[in-house]
Regions:
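Tandem repeat scaffolds
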Residues: 2-10, 16, 20-300
């Protein structure tokens, strides 16, 4: 172990010199290395090669890994709190149970990766590209995921309270049973996403385009859909009490069994173009189905 540690120290020194653009330096190539349980807090490995590396239960808190290649690495349960992973290649990597609170992951490329049960609270994920990756059961409170692209990302059963997804494109992604009070999707596009049983109280969907998404059994009390474009969405048995719809374009929504009690700024055309039934509670508190010219679109 001492020999391995000494060798690693030499690699880190040479890498630091390489980053300074000195001819005496050498880029750290840690491909396939195993460094389980190592204390590497604050380590400088920016632009290093760690493909297929195994660092289980390691401490990399505050580490600088910006631009590093971590493809197919196994970092299960490791501590990356406050680490800089900006523009990293993370495809195929395993961060299951890892600590990434306050970490910087902006501009990272994440495909086929696993972040299940990871701690991502207050992480910065601006302009990331995520595809076919699992973020199930994560603690992602107050995560910032602005101007990113997510395809087939699974956030099911995660805590996304006060998460911010401004101007983000989400396609075929799953948010089933998430806790996401006050989550923000302002200016985003949600295409064929699943929010079944999601708790989205006070969520903000201002100027959001929502296409064929499922909110079945969801809690969207006081959600804000002003200026949104909502097309072909399933809100069956959802709770939309007190939700706002000012200037939104709402077409072909399924409100069967939905509670719209106290919903604000709904128009007769919105409800006339949507499905309602005898289980629907309309904005004025009356029972559905909605009948045009009944005035039931006006909340009490």
């Amino acid at each position: 172990m001492l020999q391995a540690t000494t060798s690693l120290a030499g690699i880190l020194r040479a890498h630091k010199v390489w980053l300074e653009k000195s001819a005496d330096g050498r880029r750290a190539n840690l491909h396939g290395i195993t460094l389980n349980d190592q204390d590497l807090h604050g380590v400088l490995l920016s632009r290093a090669i760690l493909t297929n590396a195994t660092l289980l239960d390691a401490n990399l808190s505050g580490a600088n890994l910006a631009g590093a290649q971590l493809d197919n690495g196994d970092f299960e349960r490791s501590n990356f709190a406050g680490a800089d992973l900006t523009a990293c290649e993370l495809s195929g990597a395993n961060f299951g149970g890892a600590w990434l609170s306050n970490a910087a992951l902006s501009e990272a490329s994440i495909r086929g990766a696993c972040f299940r049960r990871a701690k991502l609270s207050r992480a910065q994920m601006l302009e990331v590209t995520i595809a076919e990756s699992s973020f199930r059961e994560c603690d992602a409170r107050a995560i910032n995921c602005h101007q990113s692209r997510l395809f087939d990302a699974d956030w099911s059963e995660s805590d996304l309270t006060q998460a911010q997804f401004y101007h983000t494109r989400l396609q075929s992604s799953r948010f089933t049973s998430v806790i996401a009070e006050s989550m923000i999707f302002t200016g985003s596009k949600l295409d064929h996403c699943d929010f079944t049983r999601a708790q989205l109280e006070d969520a903000r969907f201002l100027r959001t385009e929502i296409v064929q998404c499922c909110f079945h059994d969801g809690r969207l009390i006081r959600a804000d859909f002003r200026d949104a474009k909502i097309r072909g969405c399933d809100f069956t048995r959802a709770m939309l009490d007190g939700a706002r719809f000012g200037n939104s374009q709402l077409t072909m929504a399924d409100f069967r069994g939905t509670s719209l009690r106290g919903a604000r700024e709904m128009s007769a055309d919105m409800l006339a173009q949507s499905l309602t039934d005898h289980r629907t509670i309309l904005p004025n508190g009356s029972q559905g189905p909605y009948r045009k010219f009944s005035g039931a679109e006006h909340g009490r």
